[in-house]
Amino acid sequence: MKYLYLLSLFILAGGLTSCASFERYRILYNDRIEAGNVEEATRLIENKRFYKKDRNEVLRYLELGALARMQGDLAKSNEYLNKADLLIEDRRASIGSQGLAVVSNPRVLPYRTEYFENIAVHYLKSLNYLQLNDVSAARVEARRTNIRLQELNDAVPEKPLKYHDDVLGHITMGLSYEMNGEWNNAFIAYRNAAELFIQEGKVQPYMGVRIPEQLKCDLVRMADQLGFANDASRYRRLLSPRCKDDVGEGGSLVLFWENGQGPVKEENIIGFDVMRRGDRSQVRFVNNSMGMEYDFGEDIYNEYNGFAGINTVRLALPIFRPREYPLYRADIKYPGGIQRMEMLEDLNVVAEQSLRDRFGRELANALIRLAAKEAVEAGLRSIKTKKKDGDEDNDGDEEQKKSKDEDKDEEEDVEYDETLGLILGTTMSIVNAATERADIRSWQTLPAEIHYQRVPLKRGANEIRVTFYNRYNQRLEEHYLRINGGGRLQVRHVITPDSRVLQPAATQNQKPVQP
């Protein structure tokens, strides 16, 4: 069994550069995005070998989908995101890679999207479809946002997720119903979004975000429009909304602002003490400083021989580090007024909680993987070979046979050489150190924050001005949109990875709006 692992050492060598390649490309890629050079960033993803590898294919499509969105090609964006979605749904790691992961790490496997990345695929597609006036498709994607989260919750019911629902999914669903004139369904969607902020009759933040005033107003407006007097009264009393007229003769505009760049993954090392109960065939991994403890029973104990020879393990895990971004808030000026854009989703908080949720479910397997590698190393170090005696007389064979029975119960003094075990153990130690790296791959082009606001439109041409400020209230950027008010609800977005707006001049391939 020990030598089976040795065979893996040569295979693992090919995977050692994966993480370094990603770190190198990440720097190049982010520099281009921050400079607003989306076309060069796209070419980097399209041409680099790293993104062409099968295990990184889902990342390739996720990045290209987000980049196409930045360039205003929403149909192309959905084409890429659909391909990524299919890979997320259908791809399964090969049996060989699963076996290799026992002595390696997740980087040799096809990239597994984080929980929140699974969800982001759907709400970005939903926002794309809303701008393309494809209401039914937008609604499907919004529903899939919540279906996917429910599936993740149901997968391990004894360990429910704290990131168990997504506000943006309900908001996009409500907008799609509004655009189609389905007021009752829109009310339900807005109510579901608002209820995420209500716990035990009190209003409080959800995933680091306070309930937006606009959501309060949308909920009460829908209740009033449907004649749901009791609901309208309850939510006015509970939420205390401060509402302005947000529907004009020309309809209304809902503007989404995607600000900054999402968090990046980095490596973090956590140590665990290994404790055994041989009489009960139990092994326990303990980190007292973090209050973490994992117990394993007889099956694991016997399979890995109680992880003999190791007393501590150090596990490499990814953590999310938020990135700095210069823009802090934005005001939207429209004919007749001005409104502050409100945060709807903080992806820094969502990403961190999503990772914690996953670790709560998967850390035990990672500990077994690491302990198995170190147990192999300890086993290799124990290998000894019998020393050869160059002066031994071959004619003594007959005498040895003769005394075989006499020496049967006697312990024979034999000298052993530990050199081979030392070499093999050291080799395995080097490989363990090199391969025990956290998987720091992630979807780079997601924003750090998503804000939104609804404003009324007049009939005909509307000039909308969006002014962006830093945290010191200094104006850094202004952007103008020209919207034709035709009496309907319209959705648009602006994107600021850094301090520059990448909003396209026009949305492509829109379906005609039905009267």
Model-assigned labels for residue ranges:
Residues 15-38:
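Bacterial Sec signal peptide processing site at the extreme N-terminus
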Residues 27, 63, 67, 117-120, ...:
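"A position-specific structural signal for the A-helix of alpha-solenoid helical repeats
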Residues 38-39, 74, 135, 183:
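TPR-repeat structural position
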Residues 53-57, 88-98, 150-158, 194-233:
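Boundary/linker segments of alpha-helical solenoid repeat arrays
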Residues 79-89, 143-147, 181-202:
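TPR/TPR-like (Sel1-like) alpha-helical repeat modules
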Residues 391-515:
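C-terminal soluble interaction/assembly domains
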